[in-house]
């Protein structure tokens, strides 16, 4: 075994101090065999003796064992090295158990290479030795090394345990290695440990991280024993894969079984509520959080702050933020992002200043929110200032999000040529989000030349995204380029591009209702459509006129109007007007960008019904009130 590079030291002195520091020994200890054992251990440093003289002192080995465990808990690498040297000098290099504890101590201290040296020098290894090394590599995010040593373990004929497989599965989860996951699943089935609590939980967690949610569900449902961690992992898996409704249903199922709730489960459920704009259920979850004692937990608080902001309740979001005593950078970024999404620049700037006064240094996420709010509110010079500030003052390199925001800021201000020049100066290949920002601005200013440049790039980067074709067709329509519209439609058909089906959600009486374009499955759809017909007549008196020029189906105008009335956000709005009290705002979430016609419809609805309407689409929040929208008709 390799000896650690360490000078000879008085192990008695540092061991006593170390044990006192770790609260194993009292500061005044007159008795205890432990003190005697320290003296025995130290005596080896004081005189040259043969190890056999102390062969009866078994407690000496136990003391080294105990000190190493304390080293692991406290990250004390110097003490661990001293014990390593003592192990070599008193000829305990063949003690597998002691060496396993030494490997673990080096591991917990962050000294991976030293741990590997001890492992490689072992004359004999146990299952614990292999498991400790696999766990070490997994904790240090060294996935390849974890898989390699597992393969080495199998090649040497060692039988693995449930702990081995669960650790290797955790390693695969970092890079979402689906192939390795399948192999390990087969291996666990072959060795009859696939239904083990820890293996099953690790398997479903990995499948979910790899986007294989059906496989994760299959593993979950096949497990006879499930812990709170298992349930939490499955709920989180649904949320990671954007199956938010399924996450809420599973959580309710767990509640009926009176399972213990932890902060990770609660955060996942809160996240599901925020992405469904399910404010009522979100409030209920917040109450559960406070009752469970997690209200002051900064991790959970960040989820609650985000939920209220995404549901359009900024007041509640800020109250929760204010109540957290120890705020971290994530929490600051969450509240700043919340106000930015609602286009509240004044509050964003104030929070940014307070954040710095609190000793927090802004990061890339912070500047994404700052640039975003500048784009939503037309603050061109402020946007330029922040873009420069992040580089010169904070040494942050702008990423895709920052460049996309800057293109959006310039484009919204009509500075399309400058936005295009910025894109050409980007030190990496511009992404779809960057070209998409330029194309959206071209629609507003009817700039056909740059629109075609941006669209061509988008067709290359996102050949299956029908939204880009639709947006270009809208620009052609605005410029009365009917022949180009026909070509665009033909290209759309020839490429067999599938448009993402529009969906909208609305939370009514503790239940999330989902509407798709052309909805027919909702139990009250006939009543909704009848009410919609009557409302359209009413809204026309307030200036609403169907924007048939943006409906690209090659049909008669009457049919185009009919198709526009089938949009999911209109159906969700009508259902909300039917079911919610007149004093309640209507909150809707949409999975796509709200179309021009629906935007005009919402404006007319807010004026005709005197209701406050909030629509959260894929890009931003729209607050409709008295015939106006917070976006200023630019989105």
From Swiss-Prot:
Under InterPro entries, the record lists: DYW_dom, E_motif, Pentatricopeptide_rpt, PPR_At4g14850-like_plant, TPR-like_helical_dom_sf
Q: Where are the PPR repeats?
A: 60-94, 95-125, 126-160, 161-195, 196-226, 227-261, 262-296, 297-327, 328-362, 363-393, 399-429
Q: What is its main location?
A: mitochondrion
Region described as Type E motif: spans on this chain: 434-509
Checking Pfam families in the record gives: DYW_deaminase, E_motif, PPR, PPR_1, PPR_2
Note whether Repeat occurs among the keywords. yes
Tell me the segments the record calls region Type DYW motif: 541-635
Tell me the GO BP annotations in alphabetical order. RNA modification
SUPFAM superfamilies, per database record: TPR-like
Q: Which Gene3D superfamilies match?
A: Tetratricopeptide repeat domain
The positions making up the signal sequence are none
Where does the transit peptide start and end? 1-38
Q: Where is this region: Type E(+) motif?
A: 510-540
Family under the similarity heading: Belongs to the PPR family. PCMP-H subfamily.
Under which name does UniProt file this protein?
Answer: Pentatricopeptide repeat-containing protein At5g04780, mitochondrial
Its gene is PCMP-H16
């Amino acid at each position: 075994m390799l000896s650690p590079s360490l000078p000879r030291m008085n192990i008695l002195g540092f061991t006593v101090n170390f044990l006192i520091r770790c609260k194993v020994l009292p500061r005044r200890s007159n008795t205890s065999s432990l003190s005697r054992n320290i003296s025995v251990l130290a005596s080896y440093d004081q005189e040259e003796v043969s190890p056999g003289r102390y062969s009866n002192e078994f407690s000496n080995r136990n003391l080294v064992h105990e000190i190493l465990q304390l080293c692991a808990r406290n990250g004390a690498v110097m003490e661990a090295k001293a014990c390593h040297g003592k192990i070599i000098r008193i000829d305990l290099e063949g003690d597998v158990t002691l060496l396993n504890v030494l490997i673990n101590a080096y591991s917990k201290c962050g000294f991976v290479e030293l741990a590997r040296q001890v492992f490689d020098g072992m004359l004999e290894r146990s299952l614990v030795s292999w498991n400790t090394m696999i766990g070490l590599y997994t904790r240090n995010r060294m996935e390849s090394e974890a898989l390699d040593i597992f393969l080495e373990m199998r090649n040497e004929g060692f039988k693995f345990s449930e702990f081995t497989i669960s650790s290797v599965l955790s390693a695969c989860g970092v890079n979402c290695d689906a192939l390795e996951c399948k192999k390990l699943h087969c291996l666990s089935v072959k060795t009859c440990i696939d239904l083990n609590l820890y293996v099953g939980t690790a398997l479903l967690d990995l499948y979910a991280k790899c986007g294989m949610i059906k496989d994760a569900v299959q593993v979950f449902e096949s497990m006879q024993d499930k812990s709170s961690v298992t349930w939490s992992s499955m709920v989180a898996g649904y949320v990671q894969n954007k199956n938010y409704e399924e996450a809420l249903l599973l959580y309710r199922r767990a509640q009926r079984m009176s399972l213990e709730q932890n902060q990770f489960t609660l955060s996942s459920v809160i996240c599901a509520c925020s992405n469904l704009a399910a404010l009522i259920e979100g409030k209920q979850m917040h109450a559960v959080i406070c009752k469970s004692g997690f209200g002051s937990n900064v991790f959970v608080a960040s989820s609650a702050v985000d939920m209220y902001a995404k549901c359009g309740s900024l007041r509640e979001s800020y109250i929760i933020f204010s109540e957290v005593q120890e705020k971290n950078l994530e929490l600051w970024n969450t509240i700043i992002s919340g106000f930015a999404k609602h286009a509240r620049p004044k509050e964003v700037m104030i929070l940014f200043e307070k954040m710095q006064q609190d000793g927090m240094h802004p990061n890339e996420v912070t500047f994404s929110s700052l640039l975003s709010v500048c784009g939503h509110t037309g603050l061109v010079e402020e946007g330029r200032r922040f873009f420069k500030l992040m580089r010169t003052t904070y040494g942050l390199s702008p990423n895709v999000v920052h460049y996309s925001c800057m293109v959006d800021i310039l484009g919204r201000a009509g500075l399309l040529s400058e936005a295009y020049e910025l894109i050409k100066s980007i030190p990496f290949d511009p992404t779809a989000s960057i070209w998409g920002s330029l194309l959206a601005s071209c629609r507003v200013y009817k700039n056909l030349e740059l629109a075609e440049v941006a669209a061509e790039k988008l067709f290359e980067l996102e050949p299956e995204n029908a939204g880009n074709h639709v947006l270009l067709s809208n620009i052609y329509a605005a410029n009365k380029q009917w022949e180009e519209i026909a070509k665009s439609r033909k290209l759309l058909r020839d490429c067999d591009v599938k448009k993402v089906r529009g969906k909208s959600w609305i939370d009514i009486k503790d239940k999330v209702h989902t509407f798709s374009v052309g909805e027919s499955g909702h139990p009250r759809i006939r009543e909704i459509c009848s009410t919609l017909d009557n409302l359209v007549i009413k809204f026309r008196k307030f200036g609403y006129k169907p924007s048939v020029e943006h409906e690209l189906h090659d049909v008669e105008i009457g049919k185009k109007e009919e198709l526009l009335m089938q949009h999911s956000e209109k159906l969700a709005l009508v259902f909300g007007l039917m079911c919610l009290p007149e004093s309640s705002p209507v909150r809707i979430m949409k999975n796509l960008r709200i179309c021009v016609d629906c935007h005009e419809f919402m404006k007319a609805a807010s004026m005709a019904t005197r209701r406050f309407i909030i629509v959260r689409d894929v890009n931003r929040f729209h607050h409709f009130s008295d015939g106006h929208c917070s976006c200023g008709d630019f989105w």
